[in-house]
């Protein structure tokens, strides 16, 4: 998908909603004999490369799969501990796929808080009063787009640099938030959004944005 992530950050800098479409991208896959010539360590419930960078395998990469079987955190899909499995000579030769790990929930919370602070700094540094703050950050692989409402809620979209119509999409997400979160009698302001209708309509809006590139009248 050309739209990678959607985040909603409350006025205090707390992450109250997040949606991701991307999967961890495999960087390298290699068959190893015993003993393993890489140093692996457990960090934040993930098995990461700590030493032995080689053949496209980099320090910080996570173990994504073993012998074609996906790894979830520190366990394989059939419930075996990764480090224990790789420490057993009887399991070799073994094929391991490495790649950049998906962000954990704690990391997303921390990054949302950091972006909230950067947004405030950007507003304060403006030579003019009433600055909108950060509206877009660009890298070589994605663009971060941000729309802040009058009440301080921030809607953040990470998308492919070539994706058009993100400004319209941000405002559409705001409409969906107003219609299906704020009008929900069971939803409390500033709290995490757990509304099925919000989820459904957000996904529909993202599909429309990717197909059409923008929103027209009546969308």
UniProtKB/Swiss-Prot annotation:
GO BP field: autophagy; COPII vesicle coating; dendrite development; endoplasmic reticulum to Golgi vesicle-mediated transport; vesicle coating; vesicle tethering; vesicle-mediated transport
Keyword terms of this UniProt record: Cell membrane, Endoplasmic reticulum, ER-Golgi transport, Golgi apparatus, Membrane, Postsynaptic cell membrane, Synapse, Transport
Keyword Flavoprotein listed: no
SUPFAM superfamilies: SNARE-like
Gene3D superfamilies on file: 3.30.450.70
Tissue: Widely expressed.
Pfam families, A to Z: Sybindin (PF04099)
Protein's cellular compartments: Postsynaptic cell membrane; Golgi apparatus membrane; Endoplasmic reticulum; Vesicle
Keyword Protease: no
Predominant localisation class: membrane
GO cellular component, one term: plasma membrane
Family statement drawn from the similarity comment of this UniProt entry: Belongs to the TRAPP small subunits family. TRAPPC4 subfamily.
Function comment: Core component of the TRAPP complexes which has a function of guanine nucleotide exchange factor activity for Rab1 GTPase. Plays a role in vesicular transport from endoplasmic reticulum to Golgi and autophagy. May play a role in dendrite postsynaptic membrane trafficking.
PANTHER family, per database record: TRAFFICKING PROTEIN PARTICLE COMPLEX SUBUNIT, TRAFFICKING PROTEIN PARTICLE COMPLEX SUBUNIT 4
Subunit structure: Component of the multisubunit TRAPP (transport protein particle) complex, which includes at least TRAPPC2, TRAPPC2L, TRAPPC3, TRAPPC3L, TRAPPC4, TRAPPC5, TRAPPC8, TRAPPC9, TRAPPC10, TRAPPC11 and TRAPPC12. Interacts with SDC2.
Protein name: Trafficking protein particle complex subunit 4
Source organism (scientific name): Mus musculus (Mouse)
Name of the gene encoding the protein in the UniProt record: Trappc4
């Amino acid at each position: 998908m050309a739209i990678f992530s959607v985040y909603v950050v409350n006025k205090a800098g707390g992450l109250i909603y997040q949606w991701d479409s991307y999967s961890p991208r495999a960087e390298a896959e290699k068959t190893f004999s015993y003993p393993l010539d890489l140093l692996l360590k457990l960090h934040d419930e993930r098995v990461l490369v700590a030493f032995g960078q080689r053949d496209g395998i980099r320090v910080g990469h996570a173990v994504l799969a073993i012998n074609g079987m996906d790894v979830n955190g520190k366990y394989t899909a059939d419930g075996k501990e990764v480090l224990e499995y790789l420490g057993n000579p009887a399991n070799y030769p073994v094929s391991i796929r490495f790649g950049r790990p998906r962000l954990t929930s704690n990391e997303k919370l921390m990054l949302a808080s950091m972006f909230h602070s950067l947004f405030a700094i950007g507003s304060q540094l403006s030579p003019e009063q009433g600055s909108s703050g950060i509206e877009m950050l660009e890298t070589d692989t994605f663009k971060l787009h941000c729309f802040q409402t009058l009440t301080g809620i921030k809607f953040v979209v990470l998308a492919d640099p070539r994706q058009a119509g993100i400004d319209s999409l941000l405002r559409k997400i705001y409409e969906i938030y107003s219609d299906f979160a704020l009008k929900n009698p069971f939803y409390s302001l500033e709290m995490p959004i757990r509304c099925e209708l919000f989820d459904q309509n957000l996904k529909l809006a993202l599909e429309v944005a990717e197909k059409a590139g923008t929103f027209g009248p009546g969308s």
